[in-house]
Amino acid sequence: MYNQSFSGKELYRLTTQVERRDFGLEKNGFIKSIDDEISSALLNRTYSFKFKVVNGLFLNGLSHTLPDERFTYLCQDLILRKIYQNIKKIYNVRQADRNKIVQQIQMLLDSKKDYWIIRLDVKSFYESLDRTAILNRLYKQYRLSPLTTLLLQKIFEVPIIKESTGIPRGLSISSCLSELAMKYFDIEIKQYTGVYYYARFVDDIIIFCATKECMDNLWCLIPKKLKELSLTINITKSKKISSKELKESDANSLIYLGYSFSLKETVKDGEKSNWVLYTDISHQKVDKIKTRITKSFVNVIKNGDVGLLRDRIKYLTGNYSIKNKQTLLPVKAGIYYNYKRIDSRCLYMSPNEYI
């Protein structure tokens, strides 16, 4: 049976190799230190959280955290990780795999049969979710341990979170709470007659319908269903498109998760042949990268920090390795690895050419 407790032993399981190395404690010593730090406050139900806000994100700890408080805030982070894990395990919720969704979309777009697509963007997703409804659902179902629900309650009683709306963007618990809020909406749309593919990555939704009627009906129904969750559609970023429309003009493309999908007819021996799917980075993403490059050059004029400029350009346009905190092994990152499903390099090279 899954253990929902917040003992030092359970929280130690959630530490990374980097954290174990940085604090220089062997396993039993680490577990004892965690228990010494938080067990009394948890037992007496007096534990309190401290958060800061940076660029609209709620983060663990205070902006003036002192070196000797590092372990205190590590323990707070471990508690947040345990709350996240408890919700994820008990309610079987998890965020979708972005790369897997893109791969599936490529297969569907490349099929020979007709399809009708709805692509939706939910406006201010985290900030608009009804936190009261989500928390009441957790409190009334008694599936989480009493301590887990109490700690959740204490998180939302922290003044800077209490004064905000929705789910706090940036905290580890936010993704599982939002997935829980959307769980039955996702199931209902997946099971709707005529839908043969549905995916949602946070606030981005895509639906493949077998008929135009299904597409039109859902286009009207979904805003009503989202309204029940206190959510609204960002109509300027939402779109209906059919396989026929994708083929009619080069200007027609499907933009989703930072990718641009388009169908182009190949010409062989002077005659039109098969339709080929092209997958690139979307123009919007490329433009955003170019804007950040421009700001980086403007910034170096002000501060003269060429080294910082070099790092920023590498981050924006190149590929690099970072250490996985869990395993300490190098992990590939960068623009190519963020968009590994592209099959044309014309837009991928565009930021470098811009420099």
Please state what every model-predicted region is:
Residues 64-68, 120, 163-171, 202-204, ...:
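Glycine- and acidic
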Residues 109-202, 206-225, 253:
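Conserved polymerase palm-domain catalytic core
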Residues 97-100, 211:
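Alpha-helix N-cap recognition
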Residues 1-47, 51, 72-81, 85-96, ...:
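Right-hand nucleic-acid polymerase module
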Residues 57-92, 164-190:
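Conserved pre-motif C helix in the palm subdomain of viral-like polymerases
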Residues 37-61, 147-159:
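Reverse-transcriptase-like RNA-dependent polymerase core
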Residues 34, 38, 42, 86-87, ...:
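Hydrophobic, Leu/Ile/Phe/Ala-enriched alpha-helical segments that form helix-helix packing faces
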Residues 230-238:
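Conserved short beta-strand edge segments in small beta-sheet-based binding/regulatory domains
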